[in-house]
């Protein structure tokens, strides 16, 4: 699934009739979108609805997004380090989401304003408003 997202982005990047590309992962696609963004350059904005996904839980990784050795590789901490300082909206994350670490990463990247984190899931209207900002 992650590779499919990266491949789709590469295809869009190859087209002259496509402008800015943003990623929006809703429901179970939120974590895949977040992981794919770490491997894709040139994405304008990324919005990941984690739908309660708890990156501190082995069970979550096993049941919802099995990636061998992801925890040993730094899980979402490494992902956010690769995404920063890109625009990132994360919402609906489980209790184990490393919010303080995410904020520190964006501060170190010099763009703390580009990370938006909400505990609750956002409405579609809020997401559309955020993702279409210039």
Predicted segments, located by residue:
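Primarily recognizes the serine-hydrolase "nucleophile elbow" in alpha/beta-hydrolase
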Residues: 3-79
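Secondary-structure boundary motif
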Residues: 14-17, 39, 85, 104-111
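Hydrophobic anchor at the start of a short beta-strand
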Residues: 19-21, 88, 113-115
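C-terminal catalytic histidine-bearing segment of alpha/beta-hydrolase fold enzymes
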Residues: 63, 95-100, 106-134
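Conserved strand-to-loop "acid loop" that flanks and positions the catalytic carboxylate
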Residues: 84-95
């Amino acid at each position: 699934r992650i590779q499919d997202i990266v491949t789709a982005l590469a295809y869009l990047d190859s087209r002259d009739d496509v402008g800015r590309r943003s990623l929006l992962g809703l429901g179970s696609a939120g974590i895949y979108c977040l992981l794919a963004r770490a491997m894709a350059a040139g994405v304008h904005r990324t919005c990941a609805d984690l739908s309660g996904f708890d990156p501190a839980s082995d069970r979550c990784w096993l049941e919802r997004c099995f990636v061998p050795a992801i925890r040993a590789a730094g899980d979402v901490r490494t992902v956010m380090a690769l995404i920063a300082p890109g625009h990132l909206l994360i919402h609906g994350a489980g209790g184990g989401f490393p919010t303080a670490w995410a904020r520190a990463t964006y501060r170190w990247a010099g763009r703390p304003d580009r990370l938006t984190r909400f505990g609750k899931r956002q409405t579609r209207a809020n997401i559309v408003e955020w993702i279409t900002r210039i």
